[in-house]
Curated annotation (Swiss-Prot):
Changing residue 90 to A: Abolishes interaction with KCNJ4. This is Tax1-binding protein 3. Ubiquitous. Detected in brain, heart, kidney, lung, small intestine and skeletal muscle. Detected in various cell lines including HeLa. Weakly expressed in peripheral blood leukocytes. Keywords: Acetylation, Cell membrane, Cytoplasm, Membrane, Nucleus, Phosphoprotein, Wnt signaling pathway. It comes from Homo sapiens (Human). It is a peripheral membrane protein. One of its GO terms (molecular function) is beta-catenin binding. The lineage of its organism: Eukaryota, Metazoa, Chordata, Craniata, Vertebrata.
Length: 124
């Protein structure tokens, strides 16, 4: 799914609430991201649309806060704590996710399995 500025976005989303884990001075989320408007979208292994510059989950740490919350590799992050993530750079996304003042991160994500389930139900 790609986003065209100024056009409405239609997506099946899932809420994921991650409680950061404190390790010393750090707050750990337990996942990594890839993508962003400043990255080469043709390198994105999670989207069939090779123009999609979204932010995707590329790694989830086993037993970490993100896995416990239900985040999955390949999830596309649409929002973080109410902030639109559809047209951000990789660094902007990283900073939004790791904001020190926020111990809970509320995500809206979309994933291929959700999209396919809705499409299947519409065909039935």
């Amino acid at each position: 799914m790609s986003y065209i500025p100024g056009q409405p976005v239609t997506a099946v989303v899932q809420r994921v609430e991650i409680h950061k884990l404190r390790q010393g001075e750090n707050l750990i989320l337990g996942f990594s991201i890839g993508g962003g408007i400043d990255q080469d979208p043709s390198q994105n292994p999670f989207s069939e649309d090779k123009t999609d510059k979204g932010i995707y989950v590329t790694r989830v740490s086993e037993g970490g806060p993100a896995e416990i919350a239900g985040l999955q590799i390949g999830d596309k992050i649409m929002q973080v704590n109410g902030w639109d993530m559809t047209m951000v750079t990789h660094d902007q996304a990283r900073k939004r996710l790791t904001k020190r003042s926020e111990e809970v991160v509320r995500l809206l994500v979309t994933r291929q399995s959700l999209q396919k389930a809705v499409q299947q139900s519409m065909l039935s």
